[in-house]
């Protein structure tokens, strides 16, 4: 066969094959398209914020019940102050966006018998720390620094400071905010440094700091680290950290009576600090404002600091409302996250003796604790020679408490835990309830129609691609029919209880028992059922 004859036959065969397979190819493409189209969700994809509904409190009498419990709350504080021999104490209760109650016990000035009240200005010590980190986050949000930047970019003297080992990473701003810079615990020493000067801090850095660990591996409380954060704020903004915080945090929140320098506080509002020694009260000398004030120098009242607490509460839950605070709500929530593990107290007991394990972590200038009932507390203690203070907020319950005392290292944690626990019990408080998202409700309704026989389930556009490969439709049908037969005639299907936007459970109640139906959706838009668990409810 010559080359020309071969070429003619090849082309003839090619065109014949093309005529044969082209229609078949088109048919296969159309079939694949139809199959793909058939399994696509019938719900039109939407932006999440268009359908999102935030969790809400459902008890219309919630605030009234809280107010009715105030006499019990006040008695708890007064009894605690008397039992622990406090010269004076101020305390308050924050609900949602306001201080609904404040009170006092004893005196802020023993010599002049000045009574303590919600307006008295106490030095709140380390309760100041979260204010400093809030300022750092504001600068971060404005693009003026980054949390994982080496701190030496903002305090150049840190560049040459030796760390514990040669392989130690540079100290970051985040390390300073979470007590993970490798500095030693320094409470007794740091508490006497409030009036220190910038040059003293820089000289300390230049002379070398004794490290207890390498950065980023372990929590260890450091006042020195927060003094550095104050210095970073000053270096980045070009103004003292006190001025920056006054203008950008206190003023927007209306905290007009919160100060840094005790000599500027009106005499009738200033709480004097005391220690009980040798059978008598001895006044502690107040330190002037200085470089270390960023870790513990603020003077404020229950009523003023309550506005700051209310702002923390306002960040929850996430919502579509316009921003209205000094920093973004998402940044406030970020502050409260458990960034560094602190401890687990498996035998923690509430003051009433009820045992309930408690895990504690540190966020950005905040301590966050979660108890055995999944209740979350966020706040901070404060202690100095002459003072002790503490605040908690419970974002999911929308409540907060604060207590300030003028006794050296007065412990307020115990009484605040007691108040929160008692208040929840007396008022019957419940956390916010999450409304059912539209897609979750739709998938529930679809599941109810398909169970227990699974008719046409594979073509229903309800299930994700993993669902039937994970467990065949035959096995699912057999198991569900057995469960339905066991519970008998269906009498009721309960409301869906959402765990979040894309997972939840409900129950199918029959004459002889009930089935719990738990399901989760995929990250696709709209979400498809990727997991379904049917379990008999054992009563």
Residue ranges of model-derived segments:
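Surface-exposed, charged secondary-structure patches
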Residues: 357, 478-522, 529-531
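Short, conserved catalytic-motif segment at the N-terminal edge
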Residues: 58, 62-122, 144-146, 157-160, ...
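Short, well-ordered beta-strand elements
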Residues: 379-380, 390-393, 397-406, 516-518, ...
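Short active-site loop at a secondary-structure junction
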Residues: 80-92, 111-175, 212-224, 293-296
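Bacterial Sec-dependent N-terminal signal peptides
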Residues: 1-39
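Short, surface-exposed loop or secondary-structure junction motifs
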Residues: 109, 163-383
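Short, gly/Ser/Thr-rich active-site loops of penicillin-recognizing serine hydrolases
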Residues: 347, 375, 403-475, 539
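Sec-dependent signal peptide cleavage junction
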Residues: 33-68
């Amino acid at each position: 066969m010559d080359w020309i004859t071969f070429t003619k036959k090849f082309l003839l065969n090619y065109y014949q094959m093309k005529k044969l397979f082209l229609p078949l190819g088109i048919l296969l493409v159309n079939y694949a398209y139809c199959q793909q189209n058939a399994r696509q969700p019938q719900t039109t994809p939407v932006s999440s914020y268009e359908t999102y509904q935030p969790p809400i409190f459902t008890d219309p009498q919630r605030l009234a019940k809280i107010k009715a419990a105030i006499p019990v709350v006040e008695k708890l504080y007064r009894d605690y102050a008397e039992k622990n021999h406090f010269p004076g104490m101020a305390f308050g209760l924050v609900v949602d966006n306001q201080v609904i109650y404040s009170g006092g016990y004893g005196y802020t000035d023993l010599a002049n018998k000045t009574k303590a009240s919600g307006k008295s200005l106490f030095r709140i010590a380390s309760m100041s720390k979260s204010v400093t980190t809030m300022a750092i986050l504001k600068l971060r949000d404005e693009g003026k620094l980054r949390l994982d930047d080496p701190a030496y970019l903002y305090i150049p003297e840190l560049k040459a400071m030796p760390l514990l080992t040669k392989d130690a990473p540079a100290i970051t701003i985040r390390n300073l905010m979470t007590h993970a810079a490798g500095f030693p615990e320094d409470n007794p020493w740091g508490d006497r440094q409030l009036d220190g000067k910038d040059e003293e801090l820089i000289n300390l850095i230049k002379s070398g700091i004794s490290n207890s660990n390498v950065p980023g591996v372990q929590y260890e409380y450091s006042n020195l680290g927060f003094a550095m954060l104050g210095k970073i704020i000053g270096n980045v903004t070009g103004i003292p950290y006190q001025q920056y915080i006054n203008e950008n945090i206190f003023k927007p929140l209306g905290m007009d009576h919160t100060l840094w320098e005790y000599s500027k506080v009106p005499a009738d509002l200033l709480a004097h600090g005391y220690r009980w020694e040798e059978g008598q009260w001895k006044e502690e000398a107040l330190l002037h404002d200085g470089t270390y004030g960023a870790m513990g120098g603020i003077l404020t009242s229950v009523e003023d600091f309550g506005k700051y607490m209310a702002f923390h509460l306002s960040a929850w839950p996430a919502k579509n409302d316009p921003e209205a605070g000094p920093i973004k709500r998402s940044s406030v929530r970020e502050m409260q996250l458990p960034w560094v593990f602190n401890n687990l107290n498996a035998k923690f007991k509430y003051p009433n003796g009820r045992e309930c394990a408690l895990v504690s972590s540190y966020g950005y200038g905040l301590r966050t604790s979660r108890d055995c009932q999944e209740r979350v507390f966020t706040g901070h203690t404060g202690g100095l020679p002459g003072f002790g203070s503490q605040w908690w907020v419970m974002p999911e319950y929308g409540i907060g408490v604060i207590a300030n005392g003028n006794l050296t290292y007065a412990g307020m944690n115990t009484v605040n835990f007691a108040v929160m626990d008692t208040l929840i019990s007396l008022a019957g408080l419940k956390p916010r309830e999450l409304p059912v998202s539209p897609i979750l409700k739709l998938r529930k309704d679809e599941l109810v129609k398909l169970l227990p026989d699974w008719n046409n389930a594979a073509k229903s556009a309800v299930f994700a691609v993993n669902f039937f490969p994970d467990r065949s439709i035959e096995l699912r049908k057999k198991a569900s029919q057995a469960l339905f037969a066991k519970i008998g005639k269906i009498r009721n299907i309960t409301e869906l209880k959402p765990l979040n936007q894309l997972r939840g459970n409900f129950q199918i109640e029959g004459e002889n028992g009930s089935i719990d139906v738990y399901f989760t959706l995929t990250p696709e838009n709209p979400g498809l059922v990727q997991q379904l668990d049917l379990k008999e409810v054992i009563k």
